[in-house]
């Protein structure tokens, strides 16, 4: 008898992808055999990076994280999440929770997704304590205002962010923002 491959989808805008997102990806690979990181086009959110740039950022980081033997792929999508999950053959949607406020929203989404297709479960993973306060929105705000974003994103993502902010609003000539990983 063959064993069915467990496929999960971890959806998000990932604008930018943070260390908290990568923590969820690593931990999700403990419960699925194949994880699809679904990068939502989500133009309504007015993303800083294009969909292609966000997909590339996620792909660039995958070699640097442990996936516990599971395979991970990255795909963009612009359909209903449940349609994307079914199209990918997923049995589970992975969602990260940082706080009670996340739970309220995610609880409603899980209920709606269950109504759309009760065959696909939603699995919540609590954010690790060191990542509970990280959000893409906060990282962008900190970076735009010249704060140190190194504790929240990889060095490669930090470099992309700082480059984008410099294009939007050039920093004063005497401003130096370190790009090395935080100790």
UniProtKB/Swiss-Prot annotation:
UniProt pathway annotation: Cofactor biosynthesis; coenzyme A biosynthesis; CoA from (R)-pantothenate: step 4/5
Taken from the record, one Pfam family name reads: CTP_transf_like
Required co-factor(s) are: Mg(2+)
Q: Where does ATP bind?
A: 13-14, 21, 96-98, 106, 131-137
Annotated site residues (Transition state stabilizer) in this chain: 21
Q: Alphabetically, which GO biological process terms does the record hold?
A: coenzyme A biosynthetic process
Entry EC no(s): 2.7.7.3
Q: Which GO terms describe its cellular component?
A: cytoplasm
> Which Gene Ontology molecular function entries are recorded, alphabetically?
ATP binding; pantetheine-phosphate adenylyltransferase activity
Q: What InterPro entries is this protein classified in?
A: Cyt_trans-like (IPR004821), PPAT (IPR001980), Rossmann-like_a/b/a_fold (IPR014729)
> Which reaction is this enzyme known to catalyze?
(R)-4'-phosphopantetheine + ATP + H(+) = 3'-dephospho-CoA + diphosphate
Q: What does this protein do?
A: Reversibly transfers an adenylyl group from ATP to 4'-phosphopantetheine, yielding dephospho-CoA (dPCoA) and pyrophosphate.
* Quaternary context: Homohexamer.
Q: Which PANTHER family match?
A: PHOSPHOPANTETHEINE ADENYLYLTRANSFERASE
Return the protein name.
Phosphopantetheine adenylyltransferase
What is the originating organism of this protein?
Rhodospirillum centenum (strain ATCC 51521 / SW)
Give the classification, highest ranks. Answer: Bacteria, Pseudomonadati, Pseudomonadota, Alphaproteobacteria, Rhodospirillales
């Amino acid at each position: 008898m063959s064993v069915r491959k467990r496929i999960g989808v971890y959806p998000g805008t990932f604008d930018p992808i943070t260390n908290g997102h990568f923590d969820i990806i690593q931990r999700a690979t403990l419960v699925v055999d194949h994880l699809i990181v679904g990068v939502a086009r989500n133009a309504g959110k007015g993303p800083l990076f294009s969909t292609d740039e966000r997909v590339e950022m996620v792909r660039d980081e995958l070699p640097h994280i442990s996936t516990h033997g599971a395979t991970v792929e990255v795909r963009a999508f612009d359909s209903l999440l449940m349609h994307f999950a079914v199209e990918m053959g997923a049995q589970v949607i992975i969602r990260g929770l940082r706080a009670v406020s996340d739970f309220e929203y995610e609880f409603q989404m899980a209920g709606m997704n269950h109504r759309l297709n009760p065959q696909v479960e939603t699995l919540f993973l609590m954010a690790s304590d060191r990542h509970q306060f990280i959000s893409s929105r906060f990282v962008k705000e900190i970076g735009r205002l010249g704060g140190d974003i190194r504790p929240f994103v990889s060095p490669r993502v930090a470099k992309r962010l700082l480059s984008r902010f410099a294009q939007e609003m050039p920093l004063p000539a005497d401003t130096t923002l370190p790009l090395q990983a935080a100790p």
